[in-house]
Amino acid sequence: MNETTRQLIVHKVKHNTKRLITSIKWVIFSIVVGIVAGSCGTAFYFALSVVTDFRMKYPWLIYFLPIGGLTIVGLYHLCKDDNDTGTNLVISAIHSGDKVPFIMAPLIFVSTLITHLFGGSAGREGAALQMGGSIGSSIGRVFRFDEKDKHVMIMCGMSAAFSALFGTPMAAAIFSMEMISVGVMYYIALVPCVISSLIAHGIASYFNVTNEFFAIENIPDFTILNSVKISALAILCALVSILFCVALHSSEALYKKYLPNKYTRVFIGGCFVIIATMLVGNQTYNGTGMSVIQSSIDGSVRPEAFLLKIIFTALTLGAGFKGGEIVPSFFIGATFGCLFGNLTGFEPSLCTAVGMISLFCGVTNCPITSLLISFELFGYDGMPYFLLAIPFSYMLSGYFGLYRSQKIVYSKYKTSYINKSTH
């Protein structure tokens, strides 16, 4: 063996050994993150179920929502987290290396429970992303990972918590990689995110966390006429997704402009939600509203339901209450889809499912995740309809999004690099 051949073999052995060690490292740490974040996500699921059932049993708790808001603001001030950037901080940490403090996890855990206990209109997946991102980042700091590896740990944590809480491991694994920079997928995190997501889902399943699944009763044949109807629904959902994003961001801006004091803002915001609840006459639009999604599948919701949920959620989150925006987007999409189906005479349960997924895609700018979550929530039988609707919603929702720190790296309309933040 000559010297050149020997050096080549040594180089390849060293190179492949380094790859093997790196792979083993990520398998080990993704399991750790999956266990920790999955356990926290599972605990959060049960805690949220308890407070939701308690509120449904005692509906008068809604009148204490302003006090709950003051408690949330006080907790964040006590923990010296006055900037309160939430999910946006987790996303920007992957872009810029900002620190995600560990205190974010218990803060969002407790604050979201307070919001739901007293009837704020919010979701839960946003809380899961913050909890998971905080846990992943903290584990990375403990083991002295460099900045790039910490970014992967944050994505692992986000995937794990989302998977445990919502029971969609496929979508959860991809979501954290896709949502950060629209047009660029962080494939470096693929193996860690998949493992973390599956581990977390396994933990949740062990403790009998119920996976969300909605059965579509009747799926019509995929004809040209039906494809036109679904395309029209997707286009309308893109417009509704813009309306939802604008409502959320505008309400926050208006609250801050006219009520600059955080305590006053959250107290008045809580009063607004109480007044809105009294005007409606029920608490259909408080909390997550997951039961309304099932009613939409059955074809029985009020036509104004999607607009009222937008208003309730904007009043709640804009004032400073905590939770997520994703489940409200499911609610809005489902009720709007049901309305479309009832008005056009097209299968309401299918329109509900397509509306739900299309609106999710429009507000998150994540078409691959949207397709995967459609399979996990509704099965594969409606695949052609989801496959057609999602691209329309993605393209026509423009550069709007739930999270201002989300980057649109490549244009939706040209093969050009734009690297701009969402509206």
Model-derived regions: residue spans:
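Alpha-helical transmembrane segments and immediately membrane-proximal extracytoplasmic
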Residues: 1-423
